[in-house]
Each structure stands twice: as structure tokens, then as C-alpha cells.
Regions:
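MPN/JAMM (Mov34/JAB) isopeptidase/deubiquitinase module and associated MPN-bearing subunits/adaptors
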Residues: 1-75, 80-194
């Protein structure tokens, strides 16, 4: 597969902040963007949960995302499993596979999956350190098979600035959809991240 993925700084930062805030929990979220030929452009990320994803809250989140972001498509899913449940390098959880399959069917094109991990992801509660967080990017094709996308990005000033921003404790400000359901006054869109 000759596809590429462009992850903008806002989406990158939201994913990082979500994982940093919930160091001892699994984190899940959705990727918003578009597909242009063989290029996937991820414009935003919506943190969903720092626990398990359940049907009714997930459906409410999807409905609200479609309402607040009418010009964006849900093109993928991200997950950070703190307890290393992966059986082998690059394995994808059943939950991620199922959600990506639904996203792909709804869009009529392949969906993205970002697996977030640190060098020591098996150590529950170990704080993420700068330059120790990694993304593995996959595309679920129409044959229901995940393909790894080697999408090495040169470190540029914008991403370095966002990484530094994440490391300076702004993670306490990120709100996932679970937290919004507990307190509707909280901003699940995380508009403070630009």
C-alpha cells in the first residue's frame, strides 16, 4: 500500500495530552479528517474515554461529533493500552479492529488506526517522557486487513513546540467525552488546543 498519513499538530497534541493525563488508564479516541487520493489528513482528534468504550456513550459521542464538526469525517481511531495486551509487535486489539471496521464501512474507504505506546509501555503508571512516546499508524483496507504505514516524519519546529506544550502539564486541561458526560460544562472539543 502506497498511502501516507499527515497528522496535524492540533490532533497530535490532543492525543498526547489525553495519554499524559491518564497515565494509569487505557485511552481511546477518534480521528477526524479527510482522504485525498492516497493521502489521509488528520485534522483533529477527539478524546473519548480513559476507561472502556460502551455503546450508548459512544453513540452519543458520534452524534455530537457529527453535529459540531459537519465538515470533518471520522476517519480513524486511536488507543493507548497501558497494560500491554498485545500478543505480538504491531498487533491490533479486537476493539480497535471492530471500531475501525465500522468507520471504514461508514466512509466507504479505509480507516486509520493509531497505536500509541512508550518504550516501557508494560510498566503501568510510568510517566511518559519526552521522545519516548511513539505512534504506530495502520490502515484497515477493504479486505479487513491492517497494513502498517511507515510514516516517518522529520521533526519540525511545530511538532517540537507541541511536544513541549504537552510536557508542560497542560494534560490536566484535556477533557475526554467520558468526563463531559459526568459534567456537561466541560469542553470535550478541547478548543484551548489550537
Amino acid at each position: 500500500m502506497d498511502a501516507s498519513i499527515e497528522l496535524n499538530a492540533k490532533a497530535y497534541c490532543k492525543i498526547m495530552l489525553h495519554c499524559l493525563k491518564h497515565l494509569t488508564s487505557d485511552c481511546y479516541g477518534l480521528l477526524l479528517g479527510k482522504k485525498e487520493k492516497n493521502k489521509y489528513i488528520v485534522n483533529d482528534a477527539i478524546p473519548l474515554s480513559h476507561d472502556k468504550i460502551f455503546g450508548p456513550p459512544f453513540k452519543i459521542a458520534i452524534s455530537m461529533i457529527k453535529n459540531y464538526f459537519p465538515n470533518e469525517k471520522i476517519i480513524g481511531f486511536y488507543e493507548n493500552l497501558i497494560v500491554n495486551q498485545m500478543k505480538e509487535e504491531g498487533a491490533v486489539s479486537n476493539q480497535a479492529h471492530y471500531i475501525c471496521e465500522i468507520i471504514g464501512k461508514n466512509n466507504k474507504f479505509e480507516s486509520l488506526f493509531f497505536q500509541i505506546y512508550s518504550k516501557d509501555s508494560g510498566e503501568k503508571g510510568k510517566p511518559f517522557l519526552k521522545d519516548e512516546i511513539f505512534f504506530k499508524e495502520f490502515i484497515l483496507n477493504d479486505e479487513n486487513i491492517f497494513s502498517f504505514v511507515d510514516n516517518k516524519k522529520e521533526t519540525n519546529e511545530e511538532f517540537q513546540q507541541m511536544k513541549d506544550y504537552c510536557i508542560h502539564n497542560r494534560q490536566q486541561d484535556i477533557i475526554d467525552f467520558d468526563e463531559h458526560l459526568e459534567n456537561p460544562n466541560l469542553d470535550w472539543r478541547n478548543t484551548f488546543v489550537n
